[in-house]
Amino acid sequence: MTTMRYQLELFFTALGFFTRLPVPAWVPWSPERLNHAARFFPLVGWVVGAIGAASYLAFVQLLPPALAVLLSMAVTIRATGAFHEDGWADACDGLGGGWDRLQVLTIMKDSRIGSYGTAGLVLMLLAKAAALVELAAHGNLQVALALLAAHPLSRLASTSLIHTMQYVREDESAKSKPLARRLSATELVVAAVFGLAPLALLAPAEALAALTATAAATLWAARVFARRLGGYTGDCLGAAQQGSELACYLGILAAWNFI
């Protein structure tokens, strides 16, 4: 198998795992391949960001920016199957309602959403929508560029946790168990290239603010996960992606306020 073919298969493996988008039938799947596919998680963000940006630019031709933002968010949620939003809600439930490590992990594994998860999910969606609507005041293209930058960067944030932290679930049936192996330095560099490259679409001040805010959110999340759990779970990765995505939007907004 050629190296290029193998890398393409890994990308499609990541795309099939993290989205509901169809992938070619010839792409094989295995836990080992999913683990190695982690390097392409930010590249999946390129696809999701492009879907969101294209949807927004299409909807805003017919509708007010606020409605266009909501509809574009609905499209990206549909494309990903609310994969990361589910992780955010589970993390909110577990960290909000659990007193010790075991209880937090047990609550996070429960498929039912609780009060913390509901409140956290609603607030997250409202915050992202509000941030994007505010960005629309600076031009519709600004919203599209923010989406193109935030989705890859936030997935790089999640990927960095796989490299720096321990996976803490012992359940072999856990959906994210194949991600338990730490990324190599080379794999992290590949992920970083795909995660950081879209920042070039932004003005320098915006890119710096987005990167700073995202890094701060990721470090804070990692500290919370380490203190409460001693590592990360799949839900933690989803929560980190959601929090980092919001942080990216807020960083861009902050840059606009000081330009």
From Swiss-Prot:
Family matches, as InterPro entries: CobS (IPR003805)
Q: Which cofactor does it need?
A: Mg(2+)
Q: Does the keyword Membrane apply?
A: yes
Any single Pfam family the record assigns to this protein = CobS
Q: What does the entry give for GO biological process?
A: cobalamin biosynthetic process
Q: How does it sit in the membrane?
A: Multi-pass membrane protein
Q: Where are the transmembrane segments?
A: 10-30, 40-60, 113-133, 188-208
Catalyzed reaction equations: alpha-ribazole + adenosylcob(III)inamide-GDP = adenosylcob(III)alamin + GMP + H(+); alpha-ribazole 5'-phosphate + adenosylcob(III)inamide-GDP = adenosylcob(III)alamin 5'-phosphate + GMP + H(+)
Pathway involvement of the protein, from the record: Cofactor biosynthesis; adenosylcobalamin biosynthesis; adenosylcobalamin from cob(II)yrinate a,c-diamide: step 7/7
List locations, semicolon-separated: Cell inner membrane
Q: What is its EC number?
A: 2.7.8.26
Its chief place of residence is: membrane
> What are the annotated GO cellular component locations?
plasma membrane
Q: Which GO terms describe its molecular function?
A: adenosylcobinamide-GDP ribazoletransferase activity; cobalamin 5'-phosphate synthase activity
> What's in the keyword line of the UniProt record?
Cell inner membrane, Cell membrane, Cobalamin biosynthesis, Magnesium, Membrane, Transferase, Transmembrane, Transmembrane helix
Can you tell me which family this protein belongs to? Belongs to the CobS family.
* NCBIfam families reported for this sequence: cobS, PRK00235.1-3
Q: Which PANTHER family does its entry note?
A: ADENOSYLCOBINAMIDE-GDP RIBAZOLETRANSFERASE
Please give the function described in this protein's UniProt entry: Joins adenosylcobinamide-GDP and alpha-ribazole to generate adenosylcobalamin (Ado-cobalamin). Also synthesizes adenosylcobalamin 5'-phosphate from adenosylcobinamide-GDP and alpha-ribazole 5'-phosphate.
Q: What is this protein called?
A: Adenosylcobinamide-GDP ribazoletransferase
